[in-house]
């Protein structure tokens, strides 16, 4: 079989302007970037505001493993098969961060014959949205550091006299806003800034990866440009000596930060291998942020398509949970059905049983033990009140006996249905049965339900998420988190939803606990207010907001020839 890159290069692409017109966009609603991608102007969203909505399908997965479950492959494959069945369909996915592209995970365009193309353009830069987020974020960091420098240098009276601005009285070490970069770089997690003469008061800070920026979450959750501007104004950049928050609006930088992101608020239109439209927009990680593509992209797609297929990052305890309790809560766009991706290899890896055998080799004991993880995720999705279809992403090494056993086992669960998917090797022909089952699932009566109401106390939300969302026996708060809980509740932020920042490699907080962990307590070390994004992040265990590169990073495979052809992506 050809490599992902070769398949992408040999694809016969539609001119993006023609594809956009077929999709229902007007010429002046597309800002073309060559013939392969285009920004979608928000005038399209305004024009389509009263259109009837299509069906929204959310793709999730079992607990991820190093072998890859094929969630994006299934998302794109399902989209292609829905199109092949005569439906008007659109995929909505996140823009890949270059951190994972050059780290371990690789690209995020799908794979095989279920790809968004050209894949190298998607995986590297695209239309520059992540760079815009980085630049806007770092302007905020430069602005608050500069304000601290000038206020310290001049004092209150002289500062207000010379600048015509209010004295913010920023507390020493009161700056909360880190800088960001779109790479994995662990040495930047903790730094000292402002060192040296005339460089401002020194303070401890750090870098996060851009995908973890609150600005990225704002981009993904905003309903329109005005909403994004209002949310950016609420960003908490620092605190003053009295402990009160200093916002981007207080600093006077919110307008400029939004201006940098004026084009980033527009989704990017690309296409799948069989010419189905795909909107790529925003890229928050699901372990350290809320892990879903944008509300704006979903809104536009739902007004133009019969079916919209999107995905949440990692397993159903991560991106899917946050899709429901954060994204759908804020947007009001509820899914009609969910697709839960699994593989034989994933179940064996999640069995908790050690074995020297090849993960591809038949192993009924490990398969049966790992099935508990799949069943947990089925029940987890079902508790939100929507039908769930299990998609078994088939690999060439899978045996019919194990596949048949798994299909029969799923029949005894709460799943609406279970189908094999061979989209990777067969493209649109490989997921037709899956598409038909998903279409039937979308017609089922359902009542989308959130895990907790807005008015629930913040501590109760944490407990509910841990106990019901993960199966824990409870939560434990560090002393710092206890104080933060009191402060956030006193300031009136208790009605916000919770975004758990935890490992994706286990349903629990501990990546070593496989299968369906029991009897564990979720340790919350810190609570962080994201006033602009509209949620509170609970940092759990040892999760980091700046990843590091591994021993054998992905960039080792990437190169470019004299002809300009890039190799090693995917």
From Swiss-Prot:
It catalyses: (6S)-5,6,7,8-tetrahydrofolate + formate + ATP = (6R)-10-formyltetrahydrofolate + ADP + phosphate. Pathway: One-carbon metabolism; tetrahydrofolate interconversion. ATP binds at residues 65-72. Transmembrane segments: none annotated. The keyword Iron-sulfur does not apply. Keywords: ATP-binding, Ligase, Nucleotide-binding, One-carbon metabolism. Its EC number is 6.3.4.3. It is an enzyme of class 6 (ligase). GO terms for molecular function: ATP binding; formate-tetrahydrofolate ligase activity. GO terms for biological process: tetrahydrofolate interconversion. Belongs to the formate--tetrahydrofolate ligase family. This is Formate--tetrahydrofolate ligase. It comes from Shewanella sp. (strain ANA-3). The gene is fhs.
């Amino acid at each position: 079989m050809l490599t992902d890159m070769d398949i992408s290069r040999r694809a016969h692409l539609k001119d993006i302007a023609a594809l956009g017109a077929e999709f229902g966009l007007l010429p002046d609603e597309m800002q073309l970037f060559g013939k392969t991608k285009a920004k979608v102007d928000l005038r399209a969203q305004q024009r389509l505001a009263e259109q009837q909505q299509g069906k929204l399908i959310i793709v999730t997965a079992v607990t991820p493993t190093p072998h890859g479950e094929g969630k994006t492959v299934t998302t794109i494959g399902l989209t292609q098969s829905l199109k092949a069945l005569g439906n008007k369909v659109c995929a909505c996915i996140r823009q890949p961060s270059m951190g994972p592209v050059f780290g371990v995970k690789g690209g995020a365009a799908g794979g095989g014959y279920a790809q968004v193309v050209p894949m190298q353009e998607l995986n590297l830069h695209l239309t520059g949205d992540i760079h815009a987020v980085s630049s806007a974020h770092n302007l905020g960091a430069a602005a608050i550091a500069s304000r601290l420098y000038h206020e310290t240098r001049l004092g209150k009276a002289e500062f207000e006299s010379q600048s015509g601005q209010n004295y913010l009285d920023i507390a020493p070490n009161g700056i909360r806003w880190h800088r960001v970069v779109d790479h994995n770089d662990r040495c930047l997690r903790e730094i000292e800034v402002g060192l040296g003469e005339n460089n401002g008061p020194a303070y401890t800070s750090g870098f996060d990866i851009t995908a973890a920026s609150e600005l990225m979450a704002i981009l993904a959750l905003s309903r329109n440009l005005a909403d994004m501007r209002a949310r950016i104004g609420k960003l908490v950049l620092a605190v003053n000596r009295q402990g009160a928050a200093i916002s981007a609006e207080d600093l006077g930088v919110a307008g400029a930060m939004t201006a940098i992101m004026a084009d980033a608020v527009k989704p990017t239109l690309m296409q799948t291998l069989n010419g189905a439209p795909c909107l790529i927009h925003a890229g928050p990680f699901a372990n350290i942020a809320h892990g879903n593509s944008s509300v704006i992209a979903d809104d536009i797609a739902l007004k133009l398509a019969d079916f919209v297929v999107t995905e949440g990052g990692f397993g159903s305890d991560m991106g899917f949970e946050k899709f429901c309790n954060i994204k759908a809560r804020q947007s009001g766009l509820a899914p009609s059905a969910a697709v839960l991706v699994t593989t034989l290899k994933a179940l064996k890896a999640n069995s908790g049983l050690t074995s020297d055998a090849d993960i591809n080799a038949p192993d009924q004991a490990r398969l049966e033990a790992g099935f508990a993880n799949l069943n947990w995720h089925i029940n987890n999705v079902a508790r939100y009140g929507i039908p769930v279809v299990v998609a078994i992403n088939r690999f060439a090494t899978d045996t019919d006996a194990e596949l048949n056993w798994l299909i029969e086992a799923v029949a005894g669960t709460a799943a609406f249905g279970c189908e094999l998917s061979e989209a990777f090797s067969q493209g649109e022909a490989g997921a037709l049965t899956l598409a038909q089952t998903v279409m039937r699932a979308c017609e089922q009566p359902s009542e989308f339900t959130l895990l907790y109401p807005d008015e629930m106390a913040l501590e109760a939300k944490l407990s509910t998420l841990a106990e019901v969302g993960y199966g824990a026996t409870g939560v434990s708060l560090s002393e710092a988190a206890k104080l933060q809980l009191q402060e956030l509740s006193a300031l009136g932020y208790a009605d916000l939803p919770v975004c758990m920042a935890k490992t994706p490699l286990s349903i629990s907080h501990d990546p070593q606990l496989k299968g369906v962990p029991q009897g564990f307590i979720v340790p919350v070390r810190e609570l962080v207010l994201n006033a602009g994004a509209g949620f509170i992040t609970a940092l759990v265990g040892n999760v980091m907001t700046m990843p590091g590169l591994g021993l054998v990073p992905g960039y080792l495979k990437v190169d470019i020839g004299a002809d300009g052809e890039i190799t090693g992506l995917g």
